[in-house]
From Swiss-Prot:
The gene is mpkC. This is Mitogen-activated protein kinase mpkC. Activated by tyrosine and threonine phosphorylation. The lineage of its organism: Eukaryota, Fungi, Dikarya, Ascomycota, Pezizomycotina. It catalyses: L-seryl-[protein] + ATP = O-phospho-L-seryl-[protein] + ADP + H(+); L-threonyl-[protein] + ATP = O-phospho-L-threonyl-[protein] + ADP + H(+). The keyword Membrane does not apply. It comes from Aspergillus oryzae (strain ATCC 42149 / RIB 40) (Yellow koji mold). The keyword ATP-binding applies. The modification Phosphothreonine is found at T170. The TXY motif contains the threonine and tyrosine residues whose phosphorylation activates the MAP kinases. Its EC number is 2.7.11.24. Its cofactor is Mg(2+).
Amino acid sequence: MEFIRAEILGTTFETTSRYANVQPVGLGAFGLVCSAYDQITQQHVAVKKMMNPFANASIAKRTYREVKLLKQLRHENLIGLCDIFISPLEDIYLVTELLGTDLGRLLRARPLDNKFAQYFMYQILRGLKYIHSAGVIHRDLKPSNLLVNENCDLKICDFGLARVQEPQMTGYVSTRYYRAPEIMLTWQRYGKMVDIWSAGCILAEMLRGKPLFPGKDHIHQFFLITEVLGNPPPEVVQKITSGNTQRVVNSLPNQEPRPLRAVFHEFDNDVISLLEQLLLFDPDKRLTAETALQHPYLAPYHDPDDEPAALEKFDWSFNDADLPIDTWKLMMCVAIGSAKCAPN
């Protein structure tokens, strides 16, 4: 396999000769992303260099998890993996579909017309139905992780934080504005409904053109939520596992909930109704992705015969393993060796 090496944004970028016209798109904490032209498929693609994938055992596990998720999760509303390889410098490169922009960039320009918000929300929930049916929680759903092309096709990306639903889970995940209250309150026990809360926040932001709960820190974030929803009900407070957090919540001044109709007076009744069933303190009372797809607001797009669930659960057996870096590297090589370019 022949590799071509270039310096891009101060980073060595190595690709196989299959990929031409490599141009930088963005640089983040976990990787450099470039656009390129795939000379075999004759399609434009995104090539992501994963930075220091084996820097330590924790990062190696995160890298392995993201690769496994991209390989197994195949759906029209999830970013599709086309190729994967390890370069001569032992960096990992992921090749995925290339979409022109993301929802975050669109929202920085202006609010969306209702018809676009409707279509994007349908696709978000369609993707979440599939993810959740595979036993996966995204945990970091936000506008910048929702890629969009010129046809308004939407694809969920960035599965670096995705996890299995477990009894105990870490508290600091997801970008603050879209973070479900149970993450802030209980810190450890939560499930797939954190993604549903995030989707509700994104729907409100699409129509308003600005975040619904733009907290400066997690305490301010929680305060902004109570300004709309009121104090958390007793059944939610009882689920808080931290005694300190429970005392703080119980000491809050009484805050009556505001009707969402008063908060979003410019929205139509159907979207208010959907938001009321997504943005609930109690995750057990929120609509699932599958039931939300049946809501009247999404009726123009809902098709139960074209909203597939995963055929099998994702295998999380590796997730609790405490393995040395060399073992993760070997497992990664095995995974990459069996990677195929498969259509969604």
